[in-house]
Curated annotation (Swiss-Prot):
PROSITE patterns, per database record: RIBOSOMAL_L3
Pfam annotation, one family: Ribosomal_L3
Alphabetically ordered keywords of this record: Methylation, Ribonucleoprotein, Ribosomal protein, RNA-binding, rRNA-binding
Family annotation (Gene3D superfamilies): 3.30.160.810, Translation factors
Modified residues (N5-methylglutamine): 153
PANTHER family, alphabetized: 50S RIBOSOMAL PROTEIN L3, LARGE RIBOSOMAL SUBUNIT PROTEIN UL3C
Family: Belongs to the universal ribosomal protein uL3 family.
Organism: Shewanella sediminis (strain HAW-EB3)
Function per UniProt: One of the primary rRNA binding proteins, it binds directly near the 3'-end of the 23S rRNA, where it nucleates assembly of the 50S subunit.
This protein's name: Large ribosomal subunit protein uL3
GO molecular function: rRNA binding; structural constituent of ribosome
Superkingdom assignment: Bacteria
Amino acid sequence: MAIGLIGRKVGMTRIFAEDGVSIPVTVIEIASNRVTQVKTLETDGYRALQVTTGTKKANRITKPEAGHFAKAGVEAGRGLWEVRLADGEGESIEVGAELNVDIFADVAKVDVTGQSKGKGFQGGIKRWNFHAQDMTHGNSLAHRSNGSIGQNQTPGRVFKGKKMSGHMGAERVTTQNLDVVRVDAERNLLLVKGAVPGATNGNLIIKPAVKA
């Protein structure tokens, strides 16, 4: 099954393999994903599952959200996410169904999507890995500047998309082909080898790897 689930980044730790090798892992909590809507080709033009997970205080839920959750007959969650379905996939899943971490029991590798940590306004060296200029040898002002950003009279402008200083991080990032180290269905935990995008407690989308 190639359906993705929504999880929460708990943090990183390490576990030891049988041969004593230390494996760095990220712990992802995947509580029950409750299906709030099933989108079909006939009504929506594409096939997808809309899911929610976790909980949300009643006074933080808008009336449209409350009506949507009530119509689906599920408890209000901390957000709504959509997972696309391939042809012939998930046809037996109905509104109100619950999807759990055990669907990854037979999956070897996953892709994890999240929002990267925000770094604020950064220069070209940190943001784009530009090379710094000389600290001495006559350079007294331009140690960490971007350098030339264009040509001369032709074209007489800076091209769109030029890598320059600006806001870094806080964008959607996907890390591909992470090994699944352990699936703990009792505690709703998924352990994957290596790091995943985002800060602790950030929301993640976990899907079977497309390039595995």
